[in-house]
Structures are given as C-alpha cells and as structure tokens.
Amino acid sequence: MKTIRQVSVHGGHSKEYCLHAEDLLEDIIKKYIQEGFAWVGITEHCPPLNDDLRYPDEIKAGISKKYIEKRFKKYICQVNEFKKKYSSEIKIFLGFETESYDGYIDYTKELIKTHKPDYIVGSVHHINNICFDFSRQLYGKAIKSSGDINQMYEDYFDKQYELITSLQPAVIGHFDLIRIFDTEYIKRIEKRDIRKKIVRNLKACKKNNLILDFNTRALKKKAKEPYISRSILRKAKELGVRVAPGDDSHGIMDIGTDIKTGVKILTRAGFNTDWPVPDIYTCPAQ
C-alpha cells in the first residue's frame, strides 16, 4: 500500500506573530517533524497596509502597524533560520498570507520584493475593507456593505479573481472562505451567477498553474467539510486544478489531526497524492 506523505501548503501561524494563534513557532515546527511531515509552508499573515486595516484583535490589543511590521521582519528572519536548522528533518518553505483590502496589490508586491518569500498564499479575508471571517457580526456588516448575501459572494469571487490574475500567488488559500457563517452555502454556491464566477476562478487557477489549499481548519471550527466545498472540489478535479492539503495551523493542536481527514477526502475524489510543491513566487514587483 502506498504511503502518502503528510504536507501542509498553508500553516504555521504562531502566537509570536499572530494574536489569534497559540504556541511558539519553533515548537510548531517541531510538532510537524514529530508528525512526520515531509514539508510545510510557514505562511503567517502579512502586516496591515495601515492602522485602520489591522485585525480586530490587533486593534483591541492596541498594537500599531509599525509594531506589526517590526514583528513581521523578525518572523522572516526566524523562518529562514529554522529552514537551515531543521533542513535534515523537514523541508520548510517561507511564505506569507495576503490580504485583499484597498491597495493590497501594490502593497503585496512591495512585501515580496522586500522579504523574498519562497511563495505566498493568496487569501481573501476582506469584502469592502471589512474582515468578514473574524466574527458573525463583521460577516453581517460585510453583507450589508454588498447589499445582500448573494452579492457578497459575487464580490468575494471577483476580489479573488483580481488577486489570482494580478499576483499569481503560488497557493490560493481557503478558496470558498466566504461560506464561513452561511448555513445555506451548499445551495448558494450553485446559483448561476455565483457558480459562473467560481468556475472562472478555477479556470484562472489552472491557467496560472496555482495550487488550491484544501484547508482543513474548517473542520476544527465544526464546519461540515473543509474549504473547498465538495461540489467545487469536483469541478477543480474536472478542470485539472492542482490541490494540496493545508492545515492552516494556529497552534500545535492543529497539526496532524484534521488534515488526515482532508487527505482521505482528496484520495476518494481521485486527486494525485504525490502532492504538488508550490512554485516559487515570480511575479515582478512594479
């Protein structure tokens, strides 16, 4: 029987660099090694563009953009150190996770130019500059900003398409995160206008040879299935889009648990379990 390598294309959030995470980054890496992972992408959130666009927990804690930038520089240095320190035990990729608020394209290119990651995870957490996935309250606020929930889905996938085509990130994070607080998402993603945008985005991922993060953190949050939803996953398989597991770990307890369920789902869906390794990000910063 074939042994399937454990990998995570999106993970490694730690309390040193993310207020809503737990545990030290080095302990998290040691846990990946203990669990037998072949490789992992350490992909912390990038700093905010300005103080107004900090995460709600960062605003509450009173930490500034300047502080977060300084902390991010330390993160980059530390991951590069750990890449060397643990090179005989695990392959570590240095990455970071993008945002999607106004001005993010040029800002992300500048971050890439400055910090030289191995790759980035392109994620959409904001609709109309509202961090919709942080709480039900903010999700509701994002719906109002779009007009209704169906339009919010369309706005989300339009923003994701913009991200895909402008930055070509090696990995697309939690493709359908927009469903996070929507109990009717299974029906909603089949609506014609929304579905057209989903398929358009999948085709763009295929064209640019991007990898979809099969994000199992959704299971930890008691969702019915990982991001990507089953019907979208089937379409990705049909189109030949590359997919790899991502635990989106925010602490030691997230490592080596739900990702096994994700691997089983991908195996049953017929995906190649010789997991694709992300291409090093090559989009020029202009």
Name these PLM-found stretches:
Residues E22-L25, I189-I198, E225-R234, K260-T261:
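Charged helix-capping and loop-helix junction motifs
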